Swiss-Prot record:
PANTHER family: 1-DEOXY-D-XYLULOSE 5-PHOSPHATE REDUCTOISOMERASE, 1-DEOXY-D-XYLULOSE 5-PHOSPHATE REDUCTOISOMERASE, CHLOROPLASTIC. Its EC number is 1.1.1.267. Pfam families: DXP_redisom_C, DXP_reductoisom, DXPR_C. The gene is dxr. Its cofactor is Mg(2+); Mn(2+). It catalyses: 2-C-methyl-D-erythritol 4-phosphate + NADP(+) = 1-deoxy-D-xylulose 5-phosphate + NADPH + H(+). The lineage of its organism: Bacteria, Pseudomonadati, Pseudomonadota, Gammaproteobacteria, Moraxellales. 1-deoxy-D-xylulose 5-phosphate binds at K125, S151, E152, S186, H209, S222, N227, K228, E231. Keywords: Isoprene biosynthesis, Manganese, Metal-binding, NADP, Oxidoreductase. Coiled coil: none annotated. This is 1-deoxy-D-xylulose 5-phosphate reductoisomerase. Mn(2+) binds at D150, E152, E231.
Amino acid sequence: MTQRIAVLGATGSIGDSTLSILAAHPEHYQVYALSGHGRLDKLFELCQQFRPSRVAVPENKVDDFATRLAAAQIACEVVGGQAGLDDIALDPQVDTVVAAIVGAAGLASTLSAAKAGKRVLLANKEALVMAGSLMMQAVRDNGATLLPLDSEHNAIFQCLPPQIQQNNTAIHDASHGVKKLWLTASGGPFLNKTWEQMQAASVSEAVKHPNWSMGQKISVDSATMMNKGLELIEACHLFDLAESQINVVIHPQSIIHSLVEYCDGSFLAQMGSPDMRTPIAHALAYPNRISAGVESLDLYQLSSLEFIKPDLKKFACLKLAREAMQSGQAASITLNAANEVAVEAFIKQQVSLTDIALINAQVLDKMLGKDKSVAGHAAISVRQITELNDILMIDKIAREQAQLEVMACRN
């Protein structure tokens, strides 16, 4: 039976990798819908190649894009904005939603897909970082299937007992014997650099990842290890564990993608070449397997596998993420929002790479009431989050505060 796939965030790196696999297996998959935001020329080319039934673009681009498709004789419904993304996520013709929109912009459509009981292939970290409780509740209440695309979470999923994978049973049930999860991190381009070298780093240096080909924002997050911090928060929600049960270890070779430690002393690890097509192919085909077009590891050529404890002074963002998870959902929302603003400012060369952690810390302190100079925000730390609007309110305030911190760094 052919799966009808909606790829939300089709023009990004995850979208690229996903569509390459879908193109290689037309007998299994039909590209039913696509979405794009800034790279509409590329989205048009994808529409030419895959001939989707529906496509989502920014609200102010709907008419122009529809005219362009019609001129090319491509029969495709064009929908716009957040409402369009949600409508595709809810479309009864869609079997699987690939949630690959970067940042908070992908939150609402991912939540909509879960509420519609879809099979959701999750690459959007914010769905769990910002709305972990709401997202997992929506999955449970509506019979949705949630499969992680992050290489680390996908690796952990593969190393868990089948009854946890297939029945969504509690990972902390003693009978399963799971003791800890280990998230691996490459250490990024500054693993062997000093803090001072990080402070002076250019944007081009920060986005030059040693092992992975990724988008600009996630590459900067990898350089500061905020990416791993967000993945830690994500893993807590995805696998229903406390942050104390999840360790982070730097593994520069990026061959082991994560590990599960069991109570009998066993460690199960998932290994493979550092290529996002592997976890994407796994999630698309689960519980079966398909070719991902990835070259196999040559075990004879692996001279060593290193494991290093992270330096939390140099990679302060990782420490902030763990503290945010301890403080509750509002802190995670705040940290994610502040980080998006700070990373954008770094990419625009308005702040330094090391300013990102400083901005994040200051926004957390002020939003959660630790810094009394910002009146009225202390209640956010204990605010009950029951709906998407609560999340968006905290996100908005945190972004405004982060913009003030960026301005302070520039002065």
